[in-house]
Amino acid sequence: MDNCILEIRNLSHYYDNNGNKTLDNINLKIKKNEFITLLGPSGCGKTTLIKILGGFLSQKNGEIYFFSKEISKTSPNKREINTVFQNYALFPHMNVFDNISFGLRMKKTPKDIIKEKVKTSLSLIGMPKYAYRNINELSGGQKQRVAIARAMVMEPKLLLLDEPLSALDLKMRQEMQKELKKIQRQLGITFIYVTHDQEEALTMSDRIVVMNEGIILQVGTPEEIYNEPKTKFVADFIGESNIFDGTYKKELVVSLLGYEFECLDKGFEAEEAVDLVIRPEDIKLLPKGKGHLSGIITSAIFQGVHYEMTLEIQKTNWIVQSTRLTKVGEEVDIFLEPDDIHVMHKE
């Protein structure tokens, strides 16, 4: 991979003596200036991986190369890697300036340089007039910005962010997502971001690493992860999905509920049992007799940007999302284009 700054090779970790691995043979390459997100449910190993990369925890097996140098034995303060924690970890007895400048002062940086660097950092996070504000006077979003500024002022080559927005309300979280992406682009620093929130991952990332039970399931761009999931877990975890049992009849043709649909996926055997993934927003509803399969609407909920409806077809439930309401009890047909159906091997 061109411009690779971090390479993780065959990394494993376990907390107990029974060999139950929290990380199982992790291999990953990360590029310079990349915004990469570790995404997965609680307990999947993403925070453990961040702690190992930051030097706060030692892996049981494997190697970590940072700019081609193995750093497993390197102490955290020597790694040129900084971490922003979920709880901010700010000093409540210090003001904003002193919090941000703490690391620089520990390195005995000249005062004039400290002042200039803190000023630049405050401007970058949109808080130029808050230098001497008490930490306890700040909102949650402002505290998070200060924590990020404190990490960035040290000019790390890699910034680790462990669910930094989880304590914020929805509106503030969405605003901070945009700010983080903007800051990352301006600084040109590689970010590794940890979250269980699929929206955060899809909004900010250049690439997403989907994890579960200590294993990397898929790595790709947000579009690749959403549109081309490789496993049933990924399809179900990223966005809403309809996942059905189907049969790959022949090249570019699948069978579902007795109807043969055209598809775009190749690499399957004739008559192979497969999983079919159909996103709710890709299903078109037509008058009965005008589409592929017929069903009846059994529920409809308004969700702001669209209606989410449940459609029963041959005793299977389909989730459908549309800006147009189809009333409960109405009989309709579905229509699917070839690119609306994603075919996956059975696990």
UniProtKB/Swiss-Prot annotation:
Residues 6-238 form the ABC transporter domain. Gene3D superfamilies: 2.40.50.100, P-loop containing nucleotide triphosphate hydrolases. It is a peripheral membrane protein. Coiled coil: none annotated. PROSITE patterns: ABC_TRANSPORTER_1, ABC_TRANSPORTER_2, POTA. The complex is composed of two ATP-binding proteins (PotA), two transmembrane proteins (PotB and PotC) and a solute-binding protein (PotD). This is Spermidine/putrescine import ATP-binding protein PotA. The lineage of its organism: Bacteria, Pseudomonadati, Spirochaetota, Spirochaetia, Spirochaetales.
